[in-house]
Amino acid sequence: MALPIDFITRTRALLGEEFERLEAALSADVPVSIRINPMKGTPAPKAGAPVAWCESGFYLPERLSFTFDPLFHAGAYYVQEASSMFLEQAIKAYVKEPVRCLDLCAAPGGKSTHLASLLPDGSLLVSNEVIRSRSYVLAENIAKWGHPDTIVINNDPEDIGEALPHLFDVIVTDVPCSGEGMFRKDTDSTGEWSVDNVRLCASRGRRIIHDIWNALKPGGILIYSTCTYNTEEDEENIHYIIEELGAEALPIPTQEEWQITGALRFEPVSYTH
């Protein structure tokens, strides 16, 4: 894989000696993982090792033709990167009773279907997607998952913040980003990457959080995530949320064998089934 020169320079400065591991992993085969729908009670594809931080997550020995699998279309499972399933640990750590939860940037539905399975009974999940065409895909996946008490909406974060002040106990914001975490899965994405786009995405992420902040209850939980590695979109935006919006960073418990440390950076690694 031909990585952008600026990406190599910036990421090598960030990771130091670990950059070689990242570079090798980006050229390795992409592990395939799925999350089982606990409500369906139907068999899923033959799974391999479990995803350590997700009770319903499993790696597959090989990628299947999911579009030809009726169980996939019936919502018996969802194909999702294992790193995205770490949302489960944040919810388990801090959500103990029924809540009103907003998944702000929800399409295509991976985190929303996971939230639907995780939230305590009696919770309300609102799944939002600002791009109308993507909201149709989101609605389809939510319907296939089949969980009640879930609403799909198509609104701008600013409108939600103004119309629904202090309504949500939990807001999940998997904000649009420069997609550095997509390089291994979509090699064409390397050609779309640039430092200018990183800066644009970082600014957009701050705006999204600023616009939605008013919808979060005082003392509520905001979960911020991206699928990228740079500090502008990650640590610097977290710093903005803390310093400018008055948030408090909360720890998420992890197990030593997960090899997740510090700022919870998920970097692609080679995986052997």
Set out the residue ranges of the language-model regions.
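Glycine-rich, phosphate-binding/catalytic loops in enzymes
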Residues: 156, 188-191, 240
